[in-house]
Amino acid sequence: MKIEYLSLQRITQQHADELHKAVQRVIDSGWYLQGKATNDFETAYAQYIGTQHCISCGNGLDALTLIFRAYKQLGKLHEGDEVIVPANTYIASILALTENRLKPVLVEPDMLLQLDVTRIEAAITPKTRAILLVHLYGTCAMHTIISAICKRHNLLLVEDNAQGHGLKWHEKHTGSIGDAAAHSFYPGKNLGAMGDAGAVTTDNNQLATIVRSLANYGSNRKYVFPYQGLNSRMDELQAAILMTKLTYLDHDNQRRRYIAKRYEEAIRHEAVTLIKPRNSVFHIYPILCKRRDELQQYLASKGIETLIHYPIPPHKQACYAAWNSLQLPITERIAATELSLPCNQAMTDDEVEYVIHSINTWEKTI
């Protein structure tokens, strides 16, 4: 049996007729940017997330960058201000901060691979102005302790919801629990476009107005530019595709949860550690294994594709050479042992059981 980590073709085929019709409507309209499809998606996604505003943009990194840039325009952030961020995050979270001349303060994760709330206050200094909460792997990173810390220290709470589409915390969707949130619709996400796309959600009217301007060259009306902005817009085709797929997001996430539950119930191997998050939409299903590379090669020999999220943490990347000497042992251990198993709505039950059987019989079949 051959199992891809993620087959975008199979996922697309599940709703191919509807997607073809949605794309055809855009083609026939003759309007390909900033039109009805984009407006409709922004309205629907804001309603789904539970915020007053959704501002579409070009990708998830731009969404994060625009949020911090807008807060600088509002005077809430200034160059050199510190932002607490999980050390094991994807590098986009860090890039959005350094692009805005803000200082990332890397905090180690907990046993669920999320920002460790018990380490946050020790990382706060007089220059700390915000927490960037990343719902890594599709697992909710929010905690009542984080709310209390933000109130106590007057900190902004910004969510990186790139991996958390459809996730909830206390009956509220992630993307609505902080001051603002960034969303990525990269094709491989739980809610994925057929190209790059992103969005910002917020209840802050001022922030929303500035983000929308910044995403459109800094313009608030044609040929008038109060800000130095970006060219970061979602096109009509991506909006129409996302509008179609949004209808199925909760159903797709239920399938992911079922697969994760089967893994948790049935994978039994002394060399494999299961994370077992309590609240997740399983954008990624991570396991930990000290012999990760051996296991990955073995699964490949069985036709099972796996990935690593992420093999080199941000503080060890060449682009952040000044941090290379930092000692973050938990983050580094995750980078050395994490392996992501296939877990998506297009998988069949037989494929899921084959992954389980292959792991459980690792070494017994050699």
Give each language-model segment a name:
Residues 103-112, 307:
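Short beta-strand->loop structural element characteristic of the AMP-binding/adenylate-forming
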Residues 100, 152-153, 302:
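Helix C-cap/helix->beta junction micro-motif
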Residues 88-94:
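Conserved coil-to-alpha-helix start sites within the AMP-binding
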Residues 9, 21, 38-43, 48-55, ...:
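PLP-dependent aminotransferase class I/II
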Residues 111-193, 199-201:
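Active-site phosphate-binding strand-loop segment of PLP-dependent enzymes
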Residues 1-31, 302, 342:
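N-terminal "arm"/small-domain region of PLP-dependent enzymes with the aminotransferase-like
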